[in-house]
């Protein structure tokens, strides 16, 4: 009897497999949108460098079939917003989001023409520092690198969709149904304004809305033998830490990099910019009490600040004037920097 049942089950499976699949299976892309972005990376950056988790976590979770269904007409429903890991205006996060996260609380500006308009705003300790502080054994203040943007991180849209959305504040707010004067609507206004502002002298910048866009910009600026680095773990925020072993990327030589910083937006937007005359460092971050490693930090030092605004918060924190001293800062959790791969 068991043999008869097994034979019937096998026959049923064979019959089922011989039937046509629903939804035209031959036209269904078996790969996800994220996998497509990884293959794009491999074509553009053929050096077999690993794909770090912090980058992979940004890729769209949508399947190719769902992505295709969004192509025409383009609309973002609440269910798509959730499945695509976008920041929906009706989410509980945005009901409690502080307006200071992006609009008023940006203590680390990535636009070098940025200046404070209010003299009573102070810069948190450790946001900016001098290059000489990156020495093994030094105890320094580590700024808060685990911000609310990281908590509410969205994903990139598939490039085919992102490219169809006009990068205009009103168009984005209309597509996502953002009410005027809400925190997210204000963030959209601010992000678009920052992205459309003129670059500083010697700076090349682009706001990217897809993983492929970011890869294209990094390759255009640095070539195709590159790697991407970041301070991955949000350990050591807002407290004193000890600097462990320090390594200068590319031998500590003055070089160029492409740094990308996330902006608050319904879908992932990164402000990427290439600035000459910088040094990039990797440093072990140790506990002052136990001397144990709690993180690996990436820091960038801008050697030439001559084109910066005299009111930039770096000069508020450290003193000095544009072009007078170098300015260093950590690549915060959620940001990343692309550099030429070490030859050693």
Predicted regions and their residues:
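Folded, disulfide-stabilized extracellular/luminal domains of secretory-pathway proteins
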Residues: 163-344
């Amino acid at each position: 009897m068991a043999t008869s049942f097994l034979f019937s089950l096998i026959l049923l499976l064979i019959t089922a497999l011989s039937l046509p699949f629903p939804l035209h299976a031959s036209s269904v892309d078996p790969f996800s949108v994220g996998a497509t972005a990884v293959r794009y990376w491999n074509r553009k950056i053929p050096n077999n460098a690993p794909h770090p988790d912090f980058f992979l976590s940004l890729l769209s979770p949508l399947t190719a079939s769902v992505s295709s269904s969004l192509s025409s007409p383009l609309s973002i429903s609440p269910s798509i917003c959730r499945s695509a890991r976008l920041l929906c205006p009706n989410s509980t996060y945005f009901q409690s989001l502080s307006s200071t996260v992006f609009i008023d609380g940006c203590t680390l500006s990535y636009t070098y023409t940025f200046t404070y308009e209010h003299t009573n705003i102070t810069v948190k300790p450790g946001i900016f520092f001098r290059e000489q502080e990156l020495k093994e054994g030094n105890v320094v203040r580590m700024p808060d690198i685990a911000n609310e943007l990281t908590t509410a991180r969205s994903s990139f849209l598939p490039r085919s969709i992102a490219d169809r959305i006009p990068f205009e504040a009103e168009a984005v707010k209309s597509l996502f149904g953002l009410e005027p004067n809400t925190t997210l609507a204000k963030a959209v206004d601010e992000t678009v304004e920052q992205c459309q502002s003129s670059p500083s002298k010697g700076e090349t910048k682009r706001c990217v809305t897809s993983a492929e866009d970011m890869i294209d910009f990094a390759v255009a600026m640095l070539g195709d033998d590159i790697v991407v680095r970041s301070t991955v773990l949000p350990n050591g925020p807002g407290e004193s830490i000890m600097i462990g072993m320090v390594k200068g990327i590319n031998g500590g030589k003055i070089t160029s990099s492409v740094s990308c910083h996330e902006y608050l937006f319904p879908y992932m937007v990164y402000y990427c910019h290439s600035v000459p005359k910088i040094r990039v460092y990797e440093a072990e971050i140790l506990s002052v009490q136990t001397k144990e490693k709690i993180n690996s930090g990436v820091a960038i030092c801008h050697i030439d600040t001559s084109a910066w605004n005299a009111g930039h918060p770096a000069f508020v924190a450290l003193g000095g004037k544009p072009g007078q001293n170098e300015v260093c800062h950590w690549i915060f959790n959620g940001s990343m920097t692309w550099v030429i791969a070490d030859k050693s």
